[in-house]
């Protein structure tokens, strides 16, 4: 009998994995699975991805232990006491149209995950802590198969912040499969998922010895022959199924990349000013993806299709005020304005000419340089 993470049931049973999943449901998660700690193939491939430089300037991905080994390639280098990884997921999709369904060139696109009223790191972590706080209550005294030898319980929570590759453990916890766009895709919820993990010293019985298994099994890959995400990427960042070159990815370029964006990639950014959803927007599994009921993930209306003019001329005070508690702050004001003037250059809208002429003399040299490029784009089209 196989076992995959499913939408969490309302009923309770006596098994420890089911009770853990019940805690996750009570905390507001829609999916929960439990993976063993193994040297999974995807983790073994991680050093090669780093060696190829496909992580770009994200130096934190290169974090190494005292022996010089990449931490993200093995949990043993991060938390050697970990025996099981609890992976929780919550849907953040909203009722607004996808980026591929809205084409207004005078407005920019902020990635759907960043619209929320509360930073997802905090919202998901709060739920994880609620689960973590009750785990010890589930353990029977002196149950050596579940607790470490000294009887204590060790845990650690991560929400996109720790030195591990969450999607790999999400796959092996049965939460979903890793799509060709590298996102976790769930058959019922699609890929609009925030992931949170709890590392724990709880050791469940081996999968092969229990029916149903104590650990969840990987969800089967249901991408099939579909390559829509690969074909739709404007910058060809998906270099092979399941393999992303961050240096070409619009999300990386608009969020993580500091300084100048290579000229040959600017046109591909289109109207994106923070992140990109295209590879998820075109995914067939997201056609009927349900919307979230979580209040924290309802959108701030000002962040849905914001006017490029507003973004390009934003002041530091307005940036701090508008994006307080928002992931958009990661791009910093300079990066957001840079992205906005690139989008103006891609808009083919001559109404931006006066603004770009002013911004070409901006005190921020990055904004000024990209405004000059954008100005040239519009002027060349008007001739």
Which residues are covered by each model-predicted region?
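Iron-sulfur cluster-binding cysteine motifs and their immediate structural context
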Residues: 29, 228-251, 272-296, 355
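Auxiliary alpha/beta "docking" domains used to position bulky ligands
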Residues: 2-220, 261
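Short inter-helical turns and helix N-cap capping residues of alpha-solenoid HEAT/ARM repeat scaffolds
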Residues: 333, 363-364
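Amphipathic alpha-helical scaffolding segments comprising HEAT/armadillo-like alpha-solenoid repeats
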Residues: 320-322, 349-360, 380-383
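Non-heme iron-sulfur electron-transfer modules
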Residues: 48, 86, 193-199, 238-266, ...
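Alpha-solenoid HEAT/Armadillo-like helical repeat scaffolds in large eukaryotic proteins
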Residues: 310-314, 322-327, 355-363
């Amino acid at each position: 009998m196989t076992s995959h993470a499913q939408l969490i049931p309302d009923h309770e049973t006596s098994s420890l994995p089911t009770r853990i999943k019940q805690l996750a449901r009570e905390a507001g998660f829609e999916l929960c699975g439990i993976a063993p700690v193994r040297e999974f193939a995807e983790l073994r491939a991680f050093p090669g991805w780093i060696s190829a430089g496909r992580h770009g300037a994200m130096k934190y991905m290169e974090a190494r232990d005292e022996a010089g080994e990449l931490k993200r390639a093995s949990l043993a280098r991060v938390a050697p006491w970990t025996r099981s990884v609890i992976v929780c997921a919550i849907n953040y999709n909203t009722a607004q149209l996808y980026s591929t369904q809205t084409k207004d060139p005078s407005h920019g696109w902020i990635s759907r995950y960043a619209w929320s009223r509360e930073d997802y790191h905090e919202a998901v972590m709060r739920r994880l802590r609620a689960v973590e706080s009750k785990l010890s209550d589930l353990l029977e005294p002196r149950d050596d198969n579940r607790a470490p030898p000294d009887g204590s319980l060790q845990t650690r929570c991560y929400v996109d912040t720790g030195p591990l590759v969450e999607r790999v453990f999400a796959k092996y916890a049965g939460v979903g499969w890793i799509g060709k766009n590298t996102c976790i895709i769930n058959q019922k919820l699609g890929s609009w998922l925030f992931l949170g993990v709890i590392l724990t010293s709880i050791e469940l019985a081996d999968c092969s010895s229990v029916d149903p298994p104590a650990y969840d099994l990987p969800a089967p890959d249901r991408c099939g022959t579909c390559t829509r995400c690969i074909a739709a990427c404007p910058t060809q960042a998906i270099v092979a199924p399941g393999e992303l070159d961050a240096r070409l990815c619009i999300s990386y370029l608009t969020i993580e990349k500091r300084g100048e964006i290579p000229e040959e990639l600017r046109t591909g950014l289109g109207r994106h000013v923070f992140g990109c959803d295209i590879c998820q927007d075109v995914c067939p599994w997201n056609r009927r993806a349900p919307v979230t009921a979580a209040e924290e993930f309802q959108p701030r209306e000002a962040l849905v299709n914001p006017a490029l003019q507003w973004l390009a001329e934003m002041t530091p005070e307005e940036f701090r005020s508008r994006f307080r508690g928002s992931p958009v702050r990661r791009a910093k004001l300079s990066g957001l304005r840079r992205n906005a003037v690139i989008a103006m250059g891609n808009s083919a809208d001559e109404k931006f000419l006066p603004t770009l002429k002013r911004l070409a003399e901006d005190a921020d040299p990055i904004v000024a340089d990209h405004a000059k490029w954008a100005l040239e784009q519009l002027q060349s089209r008007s001739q």
